Amino acid sequence: MVWLRPNLANTPQGRGWLAALEAGSAAALFDVDGVLIDVTGSYRRSVAEATTTLTRIMLGAEADALLTDAPSPLVMHDEIILFKLAGGFNNDWDLTQALTALWVARVREWRGQPQAQITLAEWAAQARIAAHDGHGGVRWLYEVASASAIPSSDDARWVHEEYYWGAELARHHFGHTPRFVPDAPGFVHAECALLDASVLPGLAAQGVSRFGLITGRDGPEIPSALNILAP
């Protein structure tokens, strides 16, 4: 089994791996998240909960009053997918930062202004255009939201990681003491395999002898995925 992250594709090492896959036999390459592993209750839920928590932290004492009519969590699964499809937000930490900023700006910086009426789906459409034009992702975020509404990338990262890994695994993998959700159990435990057990043998019977995974997962996320796919 060969791992190839997208940013390695044009490196000597990446080209070597691809050559190994292609040498003399058919190969099947799979994406991981959403294809081989169901991440609806892990990565996606972590983004939603992290956005909600970080938005409340950013708003401080005004949070309850400003979010009176807001949904809980502040972001729905379909809205997360729209931003993923837009481009520029494959990194969940960047997406958490962006969604938090849009919510903070909506209820505080843009309060009473036309921007406050723009839905997340509409923002995702704008993000898609920006990505197509070469200035998507976090760069686009700083173009549309004021700096006062944007949380630090470090805070966005760790609140997401604490929800995803949980307190115990955050300490184990990163030596990180949780400060946002210290009692989080970890949504990573909700991940499960999507691929039917008969698929790989079926492909092998058709002549596919090499299988690979193409993924943006990194660090401890990789063995975590392997444990699900090959327990």
Regions found by a protein language model. Give the residues of each.
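Non-catalytic pre-domain segments flanking phosphatase-related domains
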Residues: 1-30, 62, 73, 81, ...
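Active-site neighborhood of HAD-like aspartate-dependent phosphohydrolases
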Residues: 3-77, 94-97
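Short, acidic loop-to-helix structural element flanking the phosphoryl-transfer center
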Residues: 16-18, 24, 29, 139, ...
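Phosphate/oxyanion-binding active-site loops and adjacent basic polyanion-contact surfaces
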Residues: 39-43, 88, 92, 187-192, ...
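A general structural signal for alpha-helical elements within enzymatic catalytic domains
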Residues: 52-56, 101, 227-230
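Cytosolic catalytic headpiece
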Residues: 62, 85-100, 105, 111-118, ...
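A contiguous, well-ordered beta/alpha segment that forms the leading edge of an enzyme domain
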Residues: 77-85
